[in-house]
Amino acid sequence: MKIEVSTEIKNACPQFAGIAIAAKVKNTPYCEALWQKIDEFTVRYREMYTTDSIKDIVTIRATREAYKKCGKDPSRYRPSGEALCRRILRGIPLYQIDTLVDLINLVSIRFGYSIGGFDADKFEGDTLTLGIGKADEPYEGIGRGMLNIEGMPVYRDAIGGVGTPTSDNERTKLGLDTTRLFTIINGYSGKEGLREAADYMVELIKEFASAEDVELIEFE
């Protein structure tokens, strides 16, 4: 799978960089060892941050700024990385979905990135292009119904949108039958920190999802 960044994104967010991770995986409904790791990190996170101070985390702040430059209100349509962090800081447990989604969420809260997670077999075509959502562009967010993505960064495959920082699309979402994972770490703050987050993602998918044939794709 190739990833291209449109001119409109490069103009709005010139520092943007990303890393995609592709791998063969085995998903499971729940992993106790992973959730022990998540719970331990959540305790530490609540000691380090408040709902006010997370605005100063570089990755979260940069994603919010990217929304504003593209034409979206990040307080009304929160990027997922920020939304997950706010959730745990309000004392609400993270959603327990399945092992792949849960470990992606752990990487997201640890580093502050909004991360897309996809079933690669559900993509149409061989290229994803990162652009900006248009008025009335159809997009069904996972568990959200039709989502207004106008002015929002969006990855599109051959037939339409598959992922935004706020929500991925129902059409390409991960499931228990997923065997080919494709995940994208979105660095609106630039390259710094991306590789560390990607390496942690690889560590988790190898430990908890039996990942094989892991490939990292850097793009900007």
Predicted regions and their residues:
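Charge-biased, low-complexity intrinsically disordered regions
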Residues: 1-220
